[in-house]
């Protein structure tokens, strides 16, 4: 693929909205213009450029609303939310950069201003969870808001925000007649930025609270509630399904049976024995130091492991982080998944290395859908062709949730 941004991390983070083009999150020309403006600039320039574009969209929305052009206003506000959400990703880390908190707040404000102009208007919800509350929105089926319909719960991964879920999945589901629930779980979005809730492996406890909430909704068929996870959500969703048996279906895009296994293979290439790699948090100091130097000398690894990983997992050191990821495993739980389950596998997705073995171990009704580069869908989460994966997943849902 031809890069749009000059910096590799900016390319990784700044091209996600390409997947949202069919759903109103962006247009190619806007992203290309932002990339040109960022040029050789650093993370501050990246942040400021995305923020300026979002600010312009907010002005467009306000002017359209003042003139009574409510559809244009809604579209502008929602697009602004997407762009605010992209602005602060390179700035992840702890202590929380004030620009991350401000960007998150602007994102939610723009998102809610757009949702308020929906038909019917959509308001924020809160899901009670262990003494705290998780931000959520219920996106109704298009033109069928009051009908009792199946509900799809969309689940983020490491660094996605609630607007990513909206544009990547919920809009498509709404068009196909499904109600959707999008939320910020522990370690995600506002739960992390505003409340400091970190990620946890026992995701069945989180989804249990989400399903409790979903079953209070008068327009939801309580027997047709499904869970769809993408990116790290490809671990979280199957993990939840292994313990929350009220789910009628589960989707993992891609499916992960272990977060640590990817690191395990890497440290063995660095010279670790199989026994040493079996417990990442207990690796010898010399090996840990070598790995730390590799991470420190790689900008993308520094962001994904130190800035994002430490913060999301509540870790202060590489050893603490690696010890924490060991807990994200499906060992002993795969046979507990009972509902029909769909796994995706994109050919160039590095996170999908164990998807086939995970799929083979399932004992529930199961489907595996492969995506290739010849479809423009061979990368992580099929971000260059989200409309294709949405068609395939929703077709499968149509058949499973009959």
Predicted regions: what is each one?
Residues 362-378:
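Catalytic histidine neighborhood in serine/cysteine hydrolases
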Residues 337, 343-345:
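Short beta-strand/loop motif that positions the catalytic acidic residue
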Residues 197-219:
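Alpha/beta-hydrolase active-site loop
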Residues 219-231:
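Alpha/beta-hydrolase fold nucleophile elbow
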Residues 242-323, 345:
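Hydrolase active-site cap/lid region
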Residues 50, 54-57, 100-145:
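N-terminal cap/lid segment of alpha/beta-hydrolase-fold proteins
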Residues 147-157:
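Short beta-strand element of the alpha/beta-hydrolase
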Residues 372, 379-402:
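Catalytic active-site module of serine/aspartate enzymes centered on a nucleophile-bearing elbow/loop
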């Amino acid at each position: 693929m031809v890069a749009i941004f000059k910096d590799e991390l900016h390319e990784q983070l700044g091209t996600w909205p390409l997947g949202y083009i069919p759903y109103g999150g962006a247009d190619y020309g806007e992203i290309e213009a932002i990339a040109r403006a960022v040029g050789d600039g650093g993370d501050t320039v990246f942040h400021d450029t995305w923020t300026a574009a979002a600010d312009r969209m907010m002005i467009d929305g306000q002017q359209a609303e003042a003139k009574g052009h409510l559809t244009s206003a809604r579209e502008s506000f929602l697009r602004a939310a997407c762009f605010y959400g992209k602005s602060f990703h390179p700035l992840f880390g702890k202590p929380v950069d004030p620009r991350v908190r401000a960007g998150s707040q602007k994102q939610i404000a723009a998102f809610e201003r757009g949702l308020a102009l929906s038909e019917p208007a959509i308001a924020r919800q809160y899901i009670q969870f262990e003494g705290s509350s998780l931000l959520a929105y219920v996106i109704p089926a298009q033109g069928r808001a009051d009908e009792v319909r199946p509900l799809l719960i969309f689940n983020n991964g490491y660094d996605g925000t609630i607007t990513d879920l909206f544009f990547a999945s919920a809009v498509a589901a709404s068009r196909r007649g499904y109600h959707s629930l999008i939320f910020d779980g522990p370690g995600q979005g506002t739960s992390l930025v505003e409340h400091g809730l970190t990620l946890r492996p026992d995701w069945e406890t989180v989804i249990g609270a989400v399903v409790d909430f979903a079953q209070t909704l008068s327009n939801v068929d309580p027997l047709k509630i499904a869970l769809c996870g993408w990116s790290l959500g490809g671990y979280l969703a199957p993990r939840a399904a292994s313990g929350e048996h009220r789910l009628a279906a589960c989707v993992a895009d891609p499916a992960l049976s272990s977060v640590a296994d990817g690191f395990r293979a890497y440290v063995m290439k660095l010279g670790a024995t199989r026994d040493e790699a079996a417990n990442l948090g207990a690796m010898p100091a010399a090996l840990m130091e070598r790995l730390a130097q590799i991470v420190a000398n790689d900008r993308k690894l520094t962001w994904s492991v130190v800035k994002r990983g430490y913060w999301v997992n509540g870790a202060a050191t590489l050893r603490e982080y690696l010890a924490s990821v060991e807990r994200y495993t499906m060992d002993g739980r795969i046979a507990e998944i009972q509902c029909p389950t769909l796994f995706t596998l994109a050919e160039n997705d590095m996170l999908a290395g164990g998807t086939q073995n995970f799929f083979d171990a399932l004992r529930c009704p199961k489907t595996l859908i492969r995506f290739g580069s010849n479809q423009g869908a061979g990368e992580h989460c099929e971000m260059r062709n989200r409309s294709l994966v949405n068609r395939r997943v929703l077709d499968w849902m149509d058949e499973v949730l009959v």
